[in-house]
């Protein structure tokens, strides 16, 4: 007999050879009907695969995250089968699950087109209707290679040959006559796959991500547990398209990119005005929280990066400045004569350690909270660049806290409060937290890791925050906290960082004198609230759909004159508003007021102050708010007080209350 422990702690006995499906059927027929797979001793398991001994078993349905991942995994297989049935000259390569969907890379001489999608989706539905049993088969490495080669599947054979150790068995999954290399698990049959799937787009992808290899065709799709979830997802995508920060950046004249500076942003006056507001805001928070601000070099010698460990672990992501500029047809090589190899900094932390080391430090000096709006460069692959979200030149609201080990919990709690305050001020109050724990490859002792993980967990608990554990996902030098934010249309973004580091102070020989008179290593806490200004601005643009709160808006008020006669009063009102601290433009063009209002609304100006002859005579303003059809007529003096107060940043409003 096999003893099975269920999630509620209860135990049941089953005959040898029982499967998770037998377990589900013994609980209820409805659960068996909903069952897609199982977790056996924490590992995903095919629903009909026999259990191999006593085990804990949890049934997976489409209500579980693992169930949705399984649906998407099977959708990728059904896609590959449909493509090969329709286009037999196609080779399959890889087809993983990704956020909200899946993709499959195909090798085919003729290019696919999005016009092919309807035909492919129709065949996918036919495969679902056929309800082919999905059968797990085990093959030896040599047999598997021979099998795939006999089918002309050179890519699959190469994967097996390169990745699978000699003598190790592999699994394939068969559905009808079609099969694929896969570790599984899968649904019991293709009929279990909901038809709530849709092909989305095509892209090119190099085999194994190497530009020296052949270009494949990547077909993206999305799959959900039911039609409603699919429809909701497609609606979110439509809304996200409207909010795309790259489109809004051009529409609102905030920034642009160009080929001569890939991954680096050209900030326009309006975009940089928002940047300045963000920088001033976060600087005030850090000043109030006891941070000191520093500025460190961008270009440092390779010897420096060798000491920090970045030269060996991060060099491929660094921009290296050679000592020699190669010759051209008309010029000889240019030599600096210094014989140095330099690199632009990819991060600020090693430079901050140098400032810490530049003075004798005592335990009484700690903690030292050192902040920098540091410009960093990372040599991201061209294909990975994505607007403001993924750039090569970035500015971080970076800070490092040098503290004693007994101060870790307090400093963590202090940062969590700062983080929640800041994100609440931007309307991003739905935050989930993860504690990423020790990875297999790590520095430090288990005792040190125990203390560090406990300190972070205790701080989260003390702050009243619910958190999940991301086992093994910490950095090699220490555990970290991950912050996941939900925006206005339900998308999740990972922002900000908080990482505990025992390694860098050791590598760079940072020390302080303890209360015992001996030298000790400080603990280094890496933290950022925004992360990078570029990415945070991209998130804000999309979260607000370009309609920024008044305090952030690059143009806060437009005074629009109805007639030429009101032009002088429009200028007078604008001057008074500017004196009150507002960013104001005047529109006296010979256009209708409706045209002006419409144009400034497209530019997302939050307040349009309309003035005509009557307003000029009465010294009033007719205020129209973005998104509202009505207007509020108030005196200029009242408008000055009300708008100046409304335009204050949230922290400045709190300071006045």
From Swiss-Prot:
It comes from the Bacteria. Keywords: Aminoacyl-tRNA synthetase, ATP-binding, Cytoplasm, Ligase, Metal-binding, Nucleotide-binding, Protein biosynthesis, RNA-binding, tRNA-binding, Zinc. InterPro entries: aa-tRNA-synt_IIb, aa-tRNA-synth_II, aa-tRNA-synth_II/BPL/LPL, Anticodon-bd, Anticodon-bd_dom_sf, Beta-grasp_dom_sf, TGS, TGS-like. SUPFAM superfamilies: Class II aaRS ABD-related, Class II aaRS and biotin synthetases, TGS-like, ThrRS/AlaRS common domain. GO terms for molecular function: ATP binding; metal ion binding; threonine-tRNA ligase activity; tRNA binding. One of its GO terms (cellular component) is cytoplasm. GO terms for biological process: threonyl-tRNA aminoacylation. It is found in: Cytoplasm. PROSITE patterns: AA_TRNA_LIGASE_II, TGS. It holds the Pfam family TGS. Residues 1-61 form the TGS domain. Its EC number is 6.1.1.3. Its cofactor is Zn(2+). PANTHER family: THREONINE--TRNA LIGASE, CHLOROPLASTIC_MITOCHONDRIAL 2 (PTHR11451:SF44), THREONINE-TRNA LIGASE (PTHR11451). Catalyzes the attachment of threonine to tRNA(Thr) in a two-step reaction: L-threonine is first activated by ATP to form Thr-AMP and then transferred to the acceptor end of tRNA(Thr). Also edits incorrectly charged L-seryl-tRNA(Thr). Belongs to the class-II aminoacyl-tRNA synthetase family. Homodimer. HAMAP family: Thr_tRNA_synth. This is Threonine--tRNA ligase. It comes from Hyphomonas neptunium (strain ATCC 15444). The gene is thrS.
């Amino acid at each position: 007999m096999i003893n099975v422990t269920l999630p509620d702690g209860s135990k049941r006995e089953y005959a040898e050879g029982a499967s998770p499906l037998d377990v589900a059927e013994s609980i209820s027929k409805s659960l068996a009907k909903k069952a897609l797979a199982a977790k056996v001793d924490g590992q995903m398991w095919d629903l009909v695969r026999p259990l191999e001994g006593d085990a804990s078993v949890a049934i997976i349905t489409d209500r579980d995250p693992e169930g949705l991942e399984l649906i998407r995994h099977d959708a990728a297989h059904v896609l590959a089968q449909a493509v090969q049935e329709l286009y037999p000259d196609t080779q399959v390569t890889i087809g993983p699950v990704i956020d909200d969907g899946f993709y499959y890379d195909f090798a085919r001489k003729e290019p696919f087109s999005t016009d092919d999608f309807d035909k492919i989706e129709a065949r996918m539905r036919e495969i679902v209707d056929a309800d082919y049993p999905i059968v797990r088969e085990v093959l030896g490495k040599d047999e598997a290679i021979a099998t795939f080669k006999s089918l002309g599947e050179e890519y699959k054979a190469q994967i097996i040959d390169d990745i699978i150790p000699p003598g190790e068995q592999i699994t394939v999954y068969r559905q009808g006559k079609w099969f694929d290399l896969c570790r599984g698990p899968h649904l019991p049959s293709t009929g279990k796959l909901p038809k709530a799937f849709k092909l989305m787009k095509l892209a090119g992808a190099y085999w194994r991500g190497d530009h020296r290899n052949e270009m494949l065709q990547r077909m993206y799709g999305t799959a959900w547990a039911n039609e409603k979830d699919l429809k909701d997802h497609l609606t979110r995508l439509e809304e996200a398209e409207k909010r795309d920060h790259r489109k809004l950046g051009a529409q609102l004249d905030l920034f642009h990119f160009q080929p001569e500076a890939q991954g680096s942003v050209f900030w326009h006056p309006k975009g940089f005005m928002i940047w300045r507001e963000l920088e001033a805001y976060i600087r005030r928070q850090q000043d109030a929280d006891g941070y000191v601000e520093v500025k460190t070099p961008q270009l440092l010698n390779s010897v420096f990066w060798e000491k920090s460990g970045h030269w060996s672990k991060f060099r491929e992501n660094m921009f290296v400045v050679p000592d020699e500029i190669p010759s051209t047809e008309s010029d000889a090589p240019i030599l600096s004569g210094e014989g140095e190899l330099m690199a632009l900094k990819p991060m600020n932390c090693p430079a901050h350690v140098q400032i810490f080391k530049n003075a004798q430090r005592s335990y009484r000096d700690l903690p030292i909270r050192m902040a920098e709006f540091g410009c960093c460069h990372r040599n991201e692959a061209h294909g990975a660049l994505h607007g403001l979200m993924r750039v090569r030149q970035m500015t971080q609201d970076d800070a490092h806290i040098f503290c004693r080990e007994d101060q870790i919990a307090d400093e963590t709690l202090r940062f969590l409060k700062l983080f929640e305050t800041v994100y609440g001020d931007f309307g991003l109050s739905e935050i989930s937290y993860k504690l990423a724990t020790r990875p297999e490859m790590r520095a430090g002792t288990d005792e040190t890791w125990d203390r560090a993980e406990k300190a972070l967990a205790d701080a989260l608990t003390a702050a009243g925050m619910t958190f999940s554990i991301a086992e093994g996902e910490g950095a090699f030098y220490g555990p970290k906290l991950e912050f996941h934010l939900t925006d206005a249309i339900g998308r999740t973004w990972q922002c900000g960082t908080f990482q505990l580091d025992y390694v860098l102070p050791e590598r760079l020989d940072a020390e302080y004198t303890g209360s015992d008179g001996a030298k000790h290593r400080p603990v280094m806490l890496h933290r950022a609230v925004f992360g990078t200004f570029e990415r945070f601005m991209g998130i804000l643009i999309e979260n607000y759909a370009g309609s920024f709160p008044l305090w952030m808006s690059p143009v806060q008020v437009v005074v629009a004159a109805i007639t030429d006669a009101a032009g002088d009063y429009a200028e007078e009102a604008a001057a008074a508003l500017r004196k009150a601290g507002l960013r104001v433009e005047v529109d006296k063009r010979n256009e209708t007021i409706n045209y002006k209002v419409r144009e400034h609304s497209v530019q997302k100006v939050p307040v349009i102050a309309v003035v005509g002859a009557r307003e000029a005579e009465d010294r009033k303003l007719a205020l129209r708010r973005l998104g509202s059809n009505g207007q509020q007529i108030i005196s200029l003096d009242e408008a000055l007080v009300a708008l100046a107060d409304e335009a204050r940043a949230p922290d400045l409003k709190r300071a006045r209350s």
